[in-house]
């Protein structure tokens, strides 16, 4: 069976992916470095399911939870949820929500905002990438208001269906139209890097290794 793009990306790492995108002239693809993995050992890859929302401190708590759980119901299996909350004051992910997404087969969650219940999420093993941690939650405070629409995090535009990859070094967005050729090139780059590594460990001068293999 042929591996899909997300599965192949899980064998890659962000540095090689960026190098392949840079060769294509795509450099505005890395989310702000403040967005970091809750668990540094976790990777994630999948097609983006985009979400945006807004802070509203006058919302009825019941209504906020209805709209939040509606969002959880919409998240597709195999996707990576990418959320632009337009807010940097509360947590936009927590234990029960992570449990729900994990059970549904969602591959990870990226938010230009916060998370909470960190110990529980770490124990669950669900990949969450966020700017910060706080115990404040969405109840009576925040609601999602669009799904599957274009969003922007930092200077990076993200469309539903673009590919998302995250590891210890950060999160990259791969345009859907470039995903197949990018992962093909990443696998070539990693294979060549193995040859460079072997040469260096055999005592080859780094400049000579670069000239021989064309990368470093």
Question: Locations of the language-model features?
Answer:
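Intrinsically disordered, low-complexity regions enriched in acidic/Ser/Thr/Pro/Gln residues
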Residues: 1-63, 67, 71, 80, ...
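Structural motif
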Residues: 18, 28-29, 47-50, 78-82, ...
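Charged helix-capping and loop-helix junction motifs
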Residues: 66, 94-98, 145
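Extracellular/luminal Protease-associated
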Residues: 71-98, 102-112
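Short, solvent-exposed amphipathic alpha-helical segments in soluble enzyme
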Residues: 97-100, 125-127, 188-189
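Ligand/cofactor pocket segment of small-molecule handling proteins
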Residues: 102-103, 107-135
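Acidic, glycine-rich flexible loop/linker segments
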Residues: 133-209
């Amino acid at each position: 069976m042929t591996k899909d793009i997300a599965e192949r990306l899980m064998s890659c790492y962000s540095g090689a992916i960026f190098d392949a995108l840079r060769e294509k002239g795509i450099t505005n693809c890395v989310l702000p470095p403040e967005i970091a993995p809750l668990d540094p050992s976790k990777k994630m890859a999948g097609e983006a399911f985009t979400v945006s929302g807004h802070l509203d401190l006058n919302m009825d708590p019941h209504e906020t939870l209805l709209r939040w759980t509606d969002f959880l119901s919409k998240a597709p299996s195999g996707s990576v949820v990418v959320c632009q909350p337009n807010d940097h004051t509360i947590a936009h992910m927590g234990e029960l929500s992570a449990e729900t997404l994990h059970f549904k087969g969602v591959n990870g969650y990226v938010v230009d905002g916060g998370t909470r219940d960190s110990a529980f999420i770490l124990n669950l093993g669900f990949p969450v990438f966020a700017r910060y941690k706080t115990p404040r939650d969405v109840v009576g405070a925040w609601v999602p208001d669009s799904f599957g629409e274009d969003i922007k995090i930092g200077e990076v535009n993200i469309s539903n269906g673009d590919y998302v990859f995250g590891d210890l070094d950060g999160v990259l967005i791969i345009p859907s139209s470039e995903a197949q050729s990018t992962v093909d090139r990443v696998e070539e780059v990693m294979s060549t890097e193995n040859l460079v590594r072997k040469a260096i460990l055999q005592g080859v001068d780094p400049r000579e290794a670069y000239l021989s293999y064309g990368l470093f």
